[in-house]
Amino acid sequence: MRDQILSLALLLCVLHSACGLYFHISETERKCFIEEVPDETTVIVNYKVELYDPRSNGFMPSSPGIGMHVEVRDSDDKVVLSRVYSSQGRISFTSHTPGEHIICMYSNSTAWFSGAQLRVHLDIQVGEHAIDYANVAQKEKLTELQLRIRQLLDQVEQITKEQNYQRYREERFRHTSESTNSRVLWWSLAQTVVLVCMGFWQMRHLKSFFEAKKLV
């Protein structure tokens, strides 16, 4: 029981975490990230693009003409989202299949030979953590207690989705293992049959050779 409580607490900590980082790319470079997402889960991507200024030797807010093309593909390699956004924005989508979702970003700039550097601030929020509860409380006129209950219910729902996703991964892994074992077995049987046939053919060949030489 204690181990289950510790596991649940650890999972809650993971669910509350978000991915915040920044990275540098050129105006023609493509950068992709892989996010494992359960089905029917909301994902929010916040980003901001800054352009390198050689005069100040730092990064400044990018010009209005520079935007980001964002493309999202699900685990079946189907395009979930693909469009050009401004230099700063908030993107939201809902997963319909569990698994790895690939989020790719690249500048819409056509300055092929400028070599300008861009700094992209990126924050990916998945599941319950992606919900703006302050906005929810204001819209639905919830008290502090009601809002807390709503958060706990969303956390339980997200935990259920995570558990279902883990079972889905285990099932896929088991299917892959069984398929691999089956292929290994059939390959071993095929090798055995080939070796037996080769041995039989060699015995026939040696017998014919000895009979031709009148040794038998």
From Swiss-Prot:
Known function: Eca and bai are essential, though not redundant, for dorsoventral patterning of the embryo. Specifically required during early embryogenesis for the activity of maternal tkv, while the zygotic tkv is not affected. Involved in Golgi organization.
KW Endoplasmic reticulum (keyword) present: yes
Motif (Prevents secretion from ER): 213-216
Protein name according to UniProt: Transmembrane emp24 domain-containing protein eca
Cytoplasmic side: 204-216
Ranges annotated as spanning the membrane: 183-203
Classification lineage: Eukaryota, Metazoa, Ecdysozoa, Arthropoda, Hexapoda
Domain GOLD positions: 30-126
InterPro entries: Emp24-like (IPR015720), GOLD_dom (IPR009038)
Alphabetical GO biological process terms: dorsal/ventral pattern formation
Organism name: Drosophila ananassae (Fruit fly)
Keyword annotations from UniProtKB, A to Z: Coiled coil, Developmental protein, Endoplasmic reticulum, Membrane, Signal, Transmembrane, Transmembrane helix
